[in-house]
Each structure stands twice: as structure tokens, then as C-alpha cells.
Amino acid sequence: MRRKFGSKNFDYIPLTFVLPEERNGLRKFMRRNDGVWIVKPPGACAGHGIKVVTRLQEIPDRRSLVAQRYITRPHLLDGIKFDIRLYVLLTSIDPLRIYLYKEGLVRLATVKYIHDVRHLTNRFMHLTNTSVNKFSPNFQPNDSPDECKGNMWSLKSLWNYLSTMEGVNILELWNKIKDLTIKTMISAEAALVNASKKTTLSSYNFYQLFGFDVLLDGQYRPWLLEVNDYPSMEPDTPLCKLVKGQLAKDYLNLVGFHVPDLLNGKELKILRMICKQNGVCYDRQLYSNLVSWKDRRKQYIHEKMNNRKTYLKTILKRLTPDDVRVLIRHEDEISQTGDFEKIFPTSETYRYLGFFEKVRYYNLLLDAWEKEYGQNRSVGIQKLRKLCRRKYHLS
């Protein structure tokens, strides 16, 4: 994406080489430039296999590794290095729908940071992973989401600290984080669409929670260090339990998990007693992937439009049953966000459409919907309700 759209648009990831395939490129760069590198095995977690190096000889030849330029001037909290674990929820890939959790975990190292190569082997100084630092004699847990103490803070505590103590514009910083999150998910969109078509029978089965690890440098610039596709939900500390517990609740409410209709009579009776209503299992009509030829024709015509003004004028005029199902799902999610923020699509995110490998109809549909009803959702919802009363979405 950086090669295609330039570093001006994709400059939020430190220079990274995938080894052993890109070892020659790493070798050439290290010959011309001094610097520190953090090397880690792909797919590893909890700080396993990570080390900080300055020479190519310190990196194994043939192992699968990721070498990333180390940010040697991070922002510090009382002299301590830290990073931020953010939670990103993908509820759909076509159309793309992304939510960013407003709370997160700030993980602090346990030894004061020294910018000196003689200290590169000190894992308690350079690694912020709680799974590493909990073995440090200096580690202090935190049981309060409102206090800036110990080696783990809540994200809201960090924002409050940076705002009041250092005068940081948190809204501007949050917008930068949203920007890098959206661009990162778009960079994987084409691959995820292709994979989902092969493995997913229904869009209702598609959702994924990601852990984004972000570091602030000395200028408060956010850098994306890595993305975890299976972030730990273990309550390692009292604060973890508080944050992750609420996260799990909001996450499950938002994805709208559907109870399968394969339950026996006894199980259904128990479920109805718990939910105090009938029809708690999903409706198979909503799971249909069949799209009529009229739907396909409309989609084809609008995907060929290369002007936003053109499709904004026409795409919402005659909604198809398939359109209505997509829009119902969209509005249902928004009503259950909890502490998640919908960051894509919004009425302002149309500028990201140019970064997609391919223009997809449903992204255009939601862009138009957000433009028309994003600031007045009740009007759009009333329109959908009228169509649903006629069972138009099931036709």
C-alpha cells in the first residue's frame, strides 16, 4: 500500500522486513544505516522469541521472522516505555464495517528506559508485554480504571493524563489512530473478501476481534507495531478483568450472535424461559445468499460508476430487498455499539474508498446511506421499518 499510494498516506508502520524472504533487502539497508531492530517470530505472543539487535549477524539466517526498525525515542511515562493495546472489531468484510473500542490497556515496562545499546538485552526495559513484566520484581498491578498507577493503566486514564499534564490534543491523536486502523483493515480487505467467499456460508457468521498494538513516539505520533488476530482475553490483572469483561459484553452484543435453530424441544423451552420471548433462534430467510438478477444488475451498474456524485443520486432511490437486508444489519449494529465507536463507514470516510483494490457495491450503498442519514438516523430507520412491515426484505 505504501508503494502504491505513497508514504504520505501509509507512514504509520516502522520499516519492516519479512524474513528470510527479504533478508537481502534488510542486509542492504543495515549496511547503509545504523539503527536498532526488534526481531520477533510471526504468530508468537506473550513476548516469546523477541529480541532487540543492532547487527545482522544476531538474526538467524533461515528462520521465519519479522524484523522491524525499533523506535528508539518513544514517549515515556515517568521515564518508562509503554505501548497501547487497542481493540478493533470487524463485523463485516463486504461491506466493510469497522468498530474501534474506546477503552484499552496501556502496558508499561518495569525498568526506566535508557537509550543506550548496552542495555538492549534488558527485556524489562524494552518490552511492554504484561506476560513478560509480571515476572519483574518491580511489577505493580493496578485495580482501578481511573488511576495512573502501576504497570498497567486504562486507556481513558492515559488520555486524561496526557491531556491535563502534557496538554496533548486527544481528539487529534484519536483521529490519527482511527485513520491508521481504517487503512490497515483496507489493506487486507481484498484477501479477506476472497477468503470469506470460500469459507463463510453467511455474513452473519463473519466477525473478528483484533488487537492493535500502538506506540507513541516523543512527538506523540502513533505507530502501529503489530496486529494480533487472536488478542488475549485472559484477565491477567484486576484492571484486565474490568476492561476485558466489559469488552466481551459489548463485543457479543454488537455482533448479534444468532442462536442456531438446531435445538431440541427441551432446549428451546429453557431458552424461551431465559429470554422471555418466542422466536429466539435465527430465521433462515435472513441467511439467504441468493441475489436476484435485478439486484445483480443494479450492483453492476453502480460499481461501474466512477463518480461519487453520480451514485449518491441513484443508489438509494429504489432499494432492493437485498439492499434493505444490508441496511437493517447496519442499523441493528449501530444500536448495540456499547463502548465501541463505528469508524467505518461514516459520512466522512468516503475519502478512503480510493484505497480499495476494487470498488464494491455494498461499500457504495453504505457510503450513500451514511451521507443521507448519518446525522439523522431516525429518518432512515423509519424508512426501513415501513419496508419491513410489508416484508419487503424477505421477498
Predicted segment positions?
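Hydrophobic residue at the +6 position relative to the catalytic HRD Asp in the kinase catalytic loop
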Residues: 212-214
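Glycine-rich phosphate-binding loop of ATP-grasp-fold ATP-dependent ligases
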Residues: 15-17, 34-60, 75, 84-85
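Short, acidic, Ser/Thr-enriched surface-loop or helix-capping motifs
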Residues: 217
